[in-house]
């Protein structure tokens, strides 16, 4: 049993829709929790004006009854409130407005228009927009709720705005998690947040943008999710691909993956065992993954986000229609969206973990999954 989904929708279209397949029957869904995650995605110092317009909520259309999954495909939609102001420009039934031809460096505009033989880059940018991550977060919230039934907890924190990385390895404590959730920059240290706000303000003043990095942690994972037998089944590859599939993410790191200058004894984690804890490690440099599989330690993955390429001070470009030099066209955008990207990162990591979990323990009903988990835990002790 695996889970999969498809989404559709444009940034300023009527809404964003998704169909998810493979969730076992019997999972009670907390709709308030789904909407809480959607609100978390909208937070963040440096966000643009659209977040004042949208009040994202997921509307479930199929696959549940009385708040409980049925084993059938789940359909949901997140409506775009801003569509009302754009309905004459972005509509399935009509085209309006002047074509978007001053393509923006760093976006999908040029490559997408040429690939699909389009003369108006709006036909590319509306789908390529990170607005689509709203429905991704709703799906990820379902995955997190499934994992939580088995003691798996997924969280995130921002570790950089601008060039300097914070060195934090352990998953956040409950107190740190509360501070992170209260922060407009998704970080537990207010002094650090103040430094980052100053960087964002400086970029806003010069008409630029700023990127950064975030970590996603997952605790409570059993040993053995994923596989070593084929590259496409390795969980580290799947997680890296999921993170790099998020708009503006340019790199992903597993554990201490970039610290390749260390010697072998300094890079790897020794293995220990005792009757109470089972197999465990005194360190977690691998970030919870070895050989494409979870090793029982907390998962730690990092994603690096580039500065958003839509800027008030535009870069030079070429007009798609005339092929003449011009300046990139500005669209309403964020100065910094790293905190929001961290919530999206949680969602895509949770989805891949839930998928791997159901590959290992899957059944058509949640009770079957629970029995499989119990039997496996007893066997590997």
UniProtKB/Swiss-Prot annotation:
One of its GO terms (biological process) is amino acid biosynthetic process. One of its GO terms (cellular component) is cytosol. Pathway: Metabolic intermediate biosynthesis; chorismate biosynthesis; chorismate from D-erythrose 4-phosphate and phosphoenolpyruvate: step 7/7. Its EC number is 4.2.3.5. GO terms for molecular function: chorismate synthase activity; FMN binding. Residues 272-292 are annotated as: Disordered. It is an enzyme of class 4 (lyase). FMN binds at residues 127-129, 247-248, 291, 306-310, 332. Reduced FMN (FMNH(2)). Keywords: Amino-acid biosynthesis, Aromatic amino acid biosynthesis, FAD, Flavoprotein, FMN, Lyase, NADP. Signal peptide: none annotated. It catalyses: 5-O-(1-carboxyvinyl)-3-phosphoshikimate = chorismate + phosphate. NADP(+) binds at residues 41, 47. It holds the Pfam family Chorismate_synt. Its cofactor is FMNH2. Homotetramer. Belongs to the chorismate synthase family. This reaction introduces a second double bond into the aromatic ring system. PANTHER family: CHORISMATE SYNTHASE (PTHR21085:SF0). This is Chorismate synthase. It comes from Anaeromyxobacter sp. (strain Fw109-5).
